[in-house]
């Protein structure tokens, strides 16, 4: 490897993720690293537990988690178990984890991949709250609408190579797409309507529960015809 990293005008070197965390850089991964039976607070303080005497100071930890949640309008219950909250709320717990450790630079890796449209809107509001408080955000995404809606600058990487950095206000989605793939992109798809054949798969009123007994499929119905493509949308 080669190159250099400067943080607040000073060149720095990281030998481990802990080095980056200690210098104020935190990462929220696409796949969360949370312990499902633990509470929100327990997950956030894991590894950096405040100690009072010979025991973990849960009261102080909970108060700090609640303060951070309220400051950035995350609306998180510090006592809730991870297994009982939504994917969007779990992501907020991951954000709180890095904030609890003092991060000023947050790297969000494909943060909207598993979110509903409403959760995406909530995440964008949280990002705006963070930047208004002086935090810096690196948003890694393939979704151009999110770049144009939330970012000030955009750096494009294609097959691991740096292509360029642009001010988002000066470009549109077509410009960004062309930089990403190296050619003009047509977002309009002309597809002829075709008649599908007979039903080859018919699924009716499927219900299923997870290991906790919580219903995860409720009345699922799918019919697939010969020569037909059926898409499933959801999180």
Sequence positions of predicted segments:
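Glycine-rich phosphate-binding loops of nucleotide-dependent enzymes
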Residues: 1-234
């Amino acid at each position: 490897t080669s190159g250099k990293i400067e943080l607040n005008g000073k060149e720095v070197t990281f030998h481990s993720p802990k080095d980056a965390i200690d210098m104020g850089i935190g990462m929220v991964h696409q796949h969360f690293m949370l312990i499902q039976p633990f509470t929100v607070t327990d997950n956030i303080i894991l590894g950096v537990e405040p100690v009072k005497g010979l025991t973990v100071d849960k009261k102080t930890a909970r108060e700090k988690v609640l303060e951070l949640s309220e400051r950035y309008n995350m609306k998180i219950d510090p006592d809730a178990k991870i297994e009982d909250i939504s994917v969007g709320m779990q992501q907020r717990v991951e954000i709180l984890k890095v904030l609890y450790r003092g991060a000023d630079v947050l790297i969000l890796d494909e943060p909207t991949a598993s979110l509903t449209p409403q959760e995406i809107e909530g995440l964008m509001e949280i990002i705006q709250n963070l930047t208004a408080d002086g935090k810096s955000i690196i948003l890694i995404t393939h979704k151009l609408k999110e770049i144009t809606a939330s970012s000030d600058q955009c750096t494009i990487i294609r097959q691991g190579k740096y292509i360029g950095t642009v001010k988002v206000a000066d470009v549109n989605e077509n410009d960004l797409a062309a930089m990403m793939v190296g050619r003009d992109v047509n977002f309009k798809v002309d597809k002829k309507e075709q008649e599908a054949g007979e039903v080859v798969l018919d699924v009716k009123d499927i219900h299923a529960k997870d290991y906790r007994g919580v219903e995860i499929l409720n009345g699922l119905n799918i019919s697939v015809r010969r020569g037909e493509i059926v898409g499933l949308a959801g999180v």
